[in-house]
Amino acid sequence: HHSIGFLNKLRILSARYCSKLTIFPPLNLTSLERLELSNCLSLENFPEILGEMKNLLMLALDNLPLKELPVSFQNLVGLQSLYLDNCGIGWFPSSIIGMPKLSLLNATSCKGWQWVKSEEGEEKVDSIVRSNVYDFSANRCNLYDDFFSTSFSQLDHMETLCLRNNNFTFLPECIKEFQFLRRLDVSGCLHLQEIRGVPPNLVDFRAIECISLSSSSSSMLLNQ
C-alpha cells in the first residue's frame, strides 16, 4: 500500500522473499533504520526517496533484478551498510561511493555491473569527494582494467578490499597510497599479470590461483 512509505515511526521494514512484489512506493520514512528488500525477484525499480533519511543505517538489496539506482538514492545520507550481492544493477553512479557515512559496500556477483560510469560533470566532483568506505567487496563482478581508471582512488580509506574472480590485468600503482588497507584479496583473478604497488600496512594479501601473474610481481610479493 502506498501509505507504507510515510509511516514515520517505522524503524525496521523487511519485505524479503516477496517474489510477486513489482512496485515499491516512494519512501519518506524519517525513523527507518533498516530496510530489507532482498530476494524480491520481480522488483526492478528501487523506490524514490522523497527527502533526506538520516536514520537508515542498513540497506539490503541482494538478489534483485534492479537496473539502476535513482538519483534520489543519495538522500539516504545516514546509510552505513549497503548489500548488493547478485543484484542486476548495470550502472552504478560513482557519487554513491562518496556518501558521507557509507562504510560497508558488498556487491559480490553483480556480473552485469558497469563500474562507476560517470554522469556528465561528475568526474570533476569525484576528484575532490573522498569515500569513507572501509570494507568493500566486488567479487565476481566482471571487472576489467577500467575499474581502476575513474573513482578507485576515492576508496583510499579502505581497510578490507575483496576483488576475487574478476578480469582486470593489473593492480594500479596508486594502491600504494592506501595506507589504511590491511586485507586485500584478488584470488581467482586469472588474467592478473602485474602488481604495480603494495599498500604499506598490508597484513593479509591473497592472490591464490592468479595463474597469469608475472615472475617479477610474484617475486615482489615474496619479498614483502
Residue ranges: model-predicted function:
Residues 1-4, 9-50, 55-73, 78-177, ...:
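Leucine-rich repeat
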